[in-house]
Design a protein with these regions (language model features):
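Conserved AMP-binding/adenylate-forming core of the ANL superfamily
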Residues: 8, 16-61, 65-69, 86-91, ...
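A short, compositionally biased
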Residues: 11-16, 145
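Absolute protein N-terminus
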Residues: 1-2
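A generic fold-level signal
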Residues: 13, 66, 137-140
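Structural core segment of the AMP-binding/adenylate-forming
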Residues: 46, 76-159
Length: 160
């Protein structure tokens, strides 16, 4: 059974039971399934196809888990990225992983600002006129960077 199929079964058997518990939020299996399905449809709408690689660069958040399930539902491969990567490490793993779309967060824990790290790695993000069709020489397959939250940052798409 694939990962996304496990969520479908869990949502059917225990729709109102807690699937995720975070300090500031909880999600039931039904909520997790609905959120993951919505993200999966968005991935497909963004052109992600079966076999594509979707990166996830984030703190431990409900959206992180939703993105893993959504990526599997869309038939793509989730590529969780180490939140401690910076500069050359981050650039290398994004390019070497053939990531087409990258989920990230603007949430800042006092140590990590992912949008700043990504903009440092890829200055093209700060001038991108069409953030759904990025053209980054050092990451030629990367077409979109999607923030979990609403954002006004150039080069980033809001998932909300």
């Amino acid at each position: 059974m694939k990962l996304d199929e496990l969520l479908v079964v869990a949502a059917a058997q225990w729709p109102h039971k807690r699937a995720l518990i975070f300090p500031e939020s909880e999600l039931t299996f039904s909520n997790l399934h609905a959120n993951a399905k919505r993200k999966a449809r968005s991935l497909i709408g963004a052109g992600v196809q079966a076999g594509d690689h979707v990166g996830i660069l984030s703190l431990n958040l409900p959206e992180y888990v939703e993105s893993i399930f959504a990526t599997n539902m869309a038939g793509a491969t989730a590529v969780p990225l180490n939140a401690r990567y910076r500069g050359a490490e981050l650039k290398r793993v994004i390019a070497d992983s053939d990531i087409r779309l990258l989920f990230t967060t603007s949430q800042f824990d006092g140590r990590v600002d992912f949008s700043a790290h990504l903009t440092d790695c890829y200055p093209e993000l700060s001038t991108a006129l069409n953030p759904s069709q990025l053209r980054i020489g050092e990451a030629p397959l990367l077409k979109s960077v999607v923030m979990f939250e609403t954002t006004q940052k150039l080069g980033f798409i809001s998932s909300t």
